[in-house]
């Protein structure tokens, strides 16, 4: 079941990725190159060299989910990630929908402070 939302942390792998890779190989990239734990609950975003394919790797409570999309025409335009490689949920959605977000300015909104 598709279980992604704004409550997840999304990390963009900035190098081109071979789309023949699946769960184990992508998990190896996450742990080996990104230094992250693949089962940590974050969603890892991988793009093909031509940016016409995208994969999202996500650990759910009982195993990995891999979401894969191939465009028949056009390319994905990835957002510029933060220093830690993260992108926001709205940026991911816009990228998947083919909307360039380079000149969009996000206006400040109230956020409920996190409880610790």
Can you describe what each PLM-predicted range is?
Residues 1-116:
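Polybasic/polar functional segments that serve as interface/processing modules
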């Amino acid at each position: 079941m598709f279980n992604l939302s704004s409550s997840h942390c999304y990390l963009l792998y900035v190098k081109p990725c071979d789309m023949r890779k699946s769960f184990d190989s992508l998990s190896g990239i996450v742990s080996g190159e990104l230094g992250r734990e693949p089962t940590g609950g974050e969603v890892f975003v991988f793009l093909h060299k031509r940016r016409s394919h995208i994969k999202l790797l996500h650990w759910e409570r009982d195993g990995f989910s891999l979401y894969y999309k191939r465009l028949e025409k056009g390319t994905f335009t990835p957002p510029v990630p933060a220093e830690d490689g993260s992108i926001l949920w709205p940026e991911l959605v816009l990228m998947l929908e083919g909307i360039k977000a380079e000149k969009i300015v996000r206006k400040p909104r109230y956020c409920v402070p996190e409880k610790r």
